[in-house]
Amino acid sequence: NIYNKMKYLIKFYTVLIFLTIFSFKSSVADTIKIGLVIPLSGENKELGESVLKSVRLAVNDINDESIVIIPKDNQNDPLQTLEVSKELYSEGIRIIIGPIFKKNTNNLDQLSDDLIFLSFTNKVDESKKNIISSGVNSISQFNAIKKFQTLNKIERSYLFAPDTSILDEIKIGLKKSKIKLKDKFFYDPDPTLITKQIEDVTRYRIRKQNLADEIKRVENSNEINKEKKIAQLEKLDTIGGINFDSVILADFEETLKSVATSLIYTDIPPRRVTYITLNQWFDKSLLNEKMIQPIYFPSVNYDNYQKYLKRYNNYYESKSNQIAFLSYDLTGLVYYLLFKNDFIVDSRIFYEKNSFKG
């Protein structure tokens, strides 16, 4: 009858409404929100927008609707970074990708320790436990160089580093990685002084004089075929061994090239010792310096980087940059760690031993 039909319909729609509400609540509960603190206004707006695009590209590639990115504009200002981070925390967010620049991490230790920042900086700051430096820092690079030393049986590396603001970061990397060095030299990066400093530390003038003395000795000797020996000696630049089998040039751009060129001038070319430097994958001009080849350095997976650039360009019809590339990887890293932890947001996933490498 009509009464029974009405009762049935009321029960049916009540159950349907309940299931819909339950499904909605489950959907909300299952949503994983990740903060993104970047400059979206001001002079660094273009950089911030590129990072945002890269993060959205990563989320699209992950293809999991439970991941939601909440971007906030920090205006590249430390105080604004603190404020927007508080807002994100109040919204229940416990993982934030960003900020980009180290200065914007200055006030973040005022926030709760269960709010984790994956900062783009490569500067290591052990005093701030809730900030993870996600950039390619000196520790990871020296660890990679250690592996390269082992694989290539390099045992006596001489470190050359500039006496500038980056020296503290380099020293942290040396200490934490426990890399073995034959010796180290910190130079003044003034281009007018570099060659003289390299001459001194490599004993160039002594080795040069050794050659002159040897030529003179052979000239005054009664050795057989001394003319041939003299001709061979005159093809050399120096005589005398060096007590290292490799150089680690912890510098960048033109100063790096100046130091490498000075080493070649002092008769220590890359065919004689192995040239190693820090991360240079973004500097294509280094590959054009034929004299200093081969030179080895830690790098991202170059093939994957090229694939990313192509995908970004196809998606947005614009070029990405290195920082945006890092944000793409960070998004994938966060998702991977959450996946391993059954999507339970817990700061410990970033600190447990062997949870991830980077």
Regions found by a protein language model. Give the residues of each.
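Extracytosolic ligand-binding ectodomains
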Residues: 2, 9, 16-18, 24-358
